[in-house]
Amino acid sequence: MDEVGTQERIRIFDTTLRDGEQAPGISLDPLEKLEIAEQLARLGVDIIEAGFPVASQGDFDAVRQIARQVHGPVICGLSRTHVADIERCYEAVRDAEHHRIHVFISTSPSHLEHMLRMSEDQVVEAVRRAIARARELVDDVEFSPQDATRTPLPFLYRVLQVAVDEGASTLNIPDTVGYGIPWDFARMVESVRREVAGSYVISCHCHNDLGLATANSLAAVAAGARQVECCINGIGERAGNAALEEVVMGLAIRSDVIGDVTTGIDTRELARTSRLVSRLTGYPVQYNKAVVGRNAFAHESGIHQHGVLTDRSTYEVIDAASVGQEAAQIVLGKHSGRHAFQEALARMGIALEGDALNATFQRFKELADRKVELSEADLEAIVAEELGTTLADRFELVSFRVEAGTGREAVASATVLVDGTPVEASASGNGMVDALGRVLAEATALEARLTGFSVTSVTGGADALGSVAVTVDVGGHEVSGRGVSTDIVEASARALLNALNRAARVREKASNRETP
């Protein structure tokens, strides 16, 4: 059992790049994963679960790149109990300053019967072999019994004890289907600490199917867990995971109830990290999202406004500045030069050089001609868009035109460079965005269907940048795209073409893998 009294530091295990990326429609490129990982390091997370290396060559390459280039956090890879998977996972994380192998297997009766078709004894033996092999490769091994909250406790204790005996130093209790209730989940954590002997850290991994992921995570910490697994913005499969920003601020604000605990998170980076993940994944942050939502510190009721104007603590338990939610500072205008632009990015923790810097600066100058002042949020949107178009794009938008009116179909025409050759196309659709999607699909010769569309204002004002996020189904594979502009129609065209370029890269990678 871990000695809670000597481990008051709560480890924050971020799984945005693994469990978070499993959300439908999210498909991150290696450079986007690296950018998120670098921001997570600036945020101060303890462990980054960078991916599932055996899932694909692309996932393996992304994990290995993060292991080699991101410094500070432990870089972790997920693995099944198969020895070959564990060895593949090790190859992906081995170059990290600090690395971990995270081994999992299902343990609930439902999963054993319908998924694994294994007996309890067979699962125990698989865990024994897997942890022993992982421990031969690395010093830091984590074990997760998937669907733990629906696993009979005697069998759960048995599996966890075997994992500890073979060398696992972290035992994770996953509420895989969001079944847990805070007080019941806390009792489970307490019982594991009591019944499983040895030296280890207890971790929790809570899903949000009942809207209780954050509450369950905080209850687990109060019961003795010293690691929390979570995702930025709470993204993930189905209803998502525990939101990192909520867990961290819950621990900070209610230490009087939870216990005298701390994390290594620089909370001033929370809002920026949230915006970055939102833009790169194409998943918007709901306006009323706790901590990082647009309305998290907004007040409309007259009584509330009066109280906040007198003393913000009357209706706010979090200082907006402490989580990076203060008003974005105006930093640049159309007369700003390349050096000032690069310095502004550096102050934001963004380092660009070479072609990436040139492309981003050129896009900045284009938008600065239309917008009087650009804020940090504007710059973040520009960088996010341009970094998504630097990976050898096949398609480049030259020009487009859309005509629409009441009672008739929208008609669009466009010129697109396809591998450097101009291609002209025209199409009609049910509205301007649908027509744009159809004409760009025709120009690129991809069978594409728009499945999701959202638009948000990056900043306020009549000249505000609009950020458009789309999801597009291309041959049964869903990809996301984004675009920014002061013109929403142009932002939509950029987002659609960004998605089509991603789809083309996915096809090219698949073709290369099939070639001997």
Swiss-Prot record:
**What EC designation does it have?**
2.3.3.13
NCBIfam families (UniProt xref): leuA_bact (TIGR00973), PRK00915.1-3 (NF002086)
Write down the required cofactor(s). Mn(2+)
Q: Which family does it belong to?
A: Belongs to the alpha-IPM synthase/homocitrate synthase family. LeuA type 1 subfamily.
A single GO molecular function, which one? manganese ion binding
Q: Give GO cellular component annotations, separated by semicolons.
A: cytoplasm
- Region (Regulatory domain): which ranges? 396-516
What the protein does comes down to: Catalyzes the condensation of the acetyl group of acetyl-CoA with 3-methyl-2-oxobutanoate (2-ketoisovalerate) to form 3-carboxy-3-hydroxy-4-methylpentanoate (2-isopropylmalate).
Where is this chain primarily localised?
Answer: cytoplasm
Recorded catalytic reaction(s): these are: 3-methyl-2-oxobutanoate + acetyl-CoA + H2O = (2S)-2-isopropylmalate + CoA + H(+)
Q: Where is the signal peptide?
A: none
Residue ranges occupied by any Pyruvate carboxyltransferase domain in the UniProt entry: 10-271
Q: Which InterPro entries match?
A: 2-IPM_HCS-like, 2-isopropylmalate_synth_dimer, AIPM/Hcit_synth_CS, Aldolase_TIM, LeuA/HCS_post-cat, LeuA_allosteric_dom_sf, LeuA_bact_synth, PYR_CT
Protein name (record): 2-isopropylmalate synthase
Alphabetical GO biological process terms = L-leucine biosynthetic process
Lineage, top-rank taxon, reads Bacteria
- One Pfam entry name: HCS_D2
Q: Which PANTHER family match?
A: 2-ISOPROPYLMALATE SYNTHASE 1, CHLOROPLASTIC-RELATED, HOMOCITRATE SYNTHASE-RELATED
Complex and partners: Homodimer.
- Give UniProt keywords alphabetically: Amino-acid biosynthesis, Branched-chain amino acid biosynthesis, Cytoplasm, Leucine biosynthesis, Manganese, Metal-binding, Transferase
What the entry lists under CDD domains is as follows:
DRE_TIM_IPMS (cd07940)
Quote the record's binding site residues for Mn(2+): D19, H205, H207, N241
From the UniProt record, report the name of the gene that encodes this protein.
leuA
